[in-house]
Structure formats: structure tokens, C-alpha cells
Amino acid sequence: MADVARLAGVSHQTVSRVVNDHPNVRPQTRDNVLAAISQLAYRPNAAARTLVTRRTHTLGVISCDTDLVGPASMLYGIEQAAAGTYFVSVASLPALDHGSALDAVERLLGQGVEGIIVIAPSTSSVAALVGMPAEVPLVAVGCGTSAPLASVAVDNAGGAIAATRYLLGLGHRCVHLVGGPETSLDAQERAAGWRQGLAEAGIAAPAVITGDWSSRAGYLAGRTLAAIPEVTAVLCVNDQMALGVIRAMSEAGRPVPSDVSVVGFDDIPEAEFFGPPLTTVRQDFPELGRRALRLLVLKIAGGLADGPQPPVGTELVVRASAAPPRA
């Protein structure tokens, strides 16, 4: 610290104030100190800084279902957003109920976290958050408008509306849905958006075939849909099930997109390499992570009330798996 002070031309007390984020430092002085820190590759002692500031610069994340694309991508987005500013301590649970959530909160608090982000993509995980200790800064991610605390999510309904409108705009008379588990909030909101898109066009929603997010579930749904001659367009609530639908359609002699159009949701890295490349709804997980982090920082500072925040927008990525219906 003394070397930094000499290079910046300030006292070691001023260096300490800059390192510990004290507000009463002139901008030019702060810039000079930060430049000296960078030049000397100075690394503050974390333990000493914690004793001075009572801050650990550590955040907790509670998650379950991290074997699924959505929760895993949310977790990665949060970790990327926090990199270089906060340490992230993760409690990954096989299932999230009130008891396990409370245990995870207590465990993370024991590690000195300043606040906690909960990835809560299902109705049961949202219910688990009811009655959490009020003094713990908590933010929920992935739960739409359902959480009883500060929350942010992707605009699932908006993405499904856009996909449905796109398929109808190509000339399809109806769009069938391969949905997700009934307990999934993402699946519920995407189904609601699909219904709204059909309703806007005056089209009655056909029965939904649900699956467990897997390619096999999509394949089984695709076999059922392939046997219905009127089916010309299918929206899947994730890309993995879309892959299964495409395979089933091909085996049934109904190739995509010349006979049946298929649109997915997520835009996983493999989507552009499907055969054909998949038209899908892209979720902005990096932005979701940044929003969640900003909300938690505000919550820690006492500047954020509970309630849902504006959702993170989606983008329809048009590739080659959807086309106008045959004449």
C-alpha cells in the first residue's frame, strides 16, 4: 500500500479509502490511485479489507435443476456478471422446498455472503421462498411475476408470442405446441404467449403435448403430431425437444421445413447446427445475470422494494427450420 501511495502522490489512508470504496474521495484522486494500483499490480488483502469494511464481497446463489439448460445458463450468467467484483458461493440443491431453501440460506450466511440470488424456475421453488428471513437481501431469478420478493426473468410470453406470430405470418393456419412440465414457470409462460398469439389471429388453441424438456420427449411428441395431416407448424418450448420433433418428422416422411415448420426456444449453442439449422427464440442469459446482480446490489444497499422487475427481452433468430406451408 505504501508503494501505491508514493506513486499516486497521496497518503496511505487515501489509498485505503479508495480500496474500500469510501465515497469521500475526489474523482481525480481516485483515478490516480487506481492507475497506481494497476501499474503496480497491487492486490488488497481480502481479510484485512473485510475487517475494515465489514464487507466480504461475496454473494450467494441457490439453484436446483442445474442439469437443465435454463437454470445452468442463468447460473453462468450470474457468475459472469459478478466476475472481478464479487466472489460467488453456490448452493446447488437436488430440489428446492422451504426447508432446503432455509438450510441453504443459513449455510451461505455462515460463509459471510452479503446477499443471495435464488434461481427459482418452478412453482415449488417460488413457494419455498415464502417466509425467508426478512433481514436477508434476496433476489429471485427466472420466476416471472410469481415470486414474493424482488425478481427478474426473461420475457417468456413475449418470445412465444413472437414465434407464433412468425409462423402464422408465413401462412400456417395453426401452430401446435410441444410444452414443458406443468410445474415449470417458463413452460407456463411460453404456453400463455403461444395461446395469446393464436387468439390475436382468432385461432383456437389445439391440445398441448407436454414433455420433460428432453429430446426424447420431443421425439415422442413429434411422432404423435406427425400422424396428424393438418399439423404444419410446431412451436417447442425448448430447443432440445425441437430436435426430437425434427427427428420424428423426418422418420415419418414429413421433412422439416418443406412439410412441417419447427421453432424452438433458448438458442442453445448447437441450434445453428441442427439439420436444418433451428429457428428459435434466443434468451439473453448474460443480461439476465447482470440484471440479477444489479438488483441484489440495490437490495443490499436498501434501495429496492420487493416485486417483479421489467423482464429481459428475447430475440427471434430466423434460420432454416420454418417455411411457408405447401400450397
Where in the sequence are the language-model features?
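N-terminal helix-turn-helix DNA-binding module of bacterial transcription factors
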Residues: 1-57, 326
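Short beta-strand segments enriched in small/hydrophobic residues
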Residues: 14-17, 51-67, 166, 174-180
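Glycine-rich phosphate-binding loop signature in dinucleotide/nucleotide-binding domains
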Residues: 40, 110-112, 166, 170-171, ...
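Hinge/beta->alpha junction and helix N-cap segments in small-molecule ligand-binding domains
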Residues: 46, 64-73, 91-100, 143, ...
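Alpha-helical recognition/docking segments in bacterial nutrient-uptake
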Residues: 58-165, 169
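Periplasmic-binding protein-like
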Residues: 112-120, 176-178, 208-209, 229-238, ...
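Flexible loop/turn connectors
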Residues: 228-327
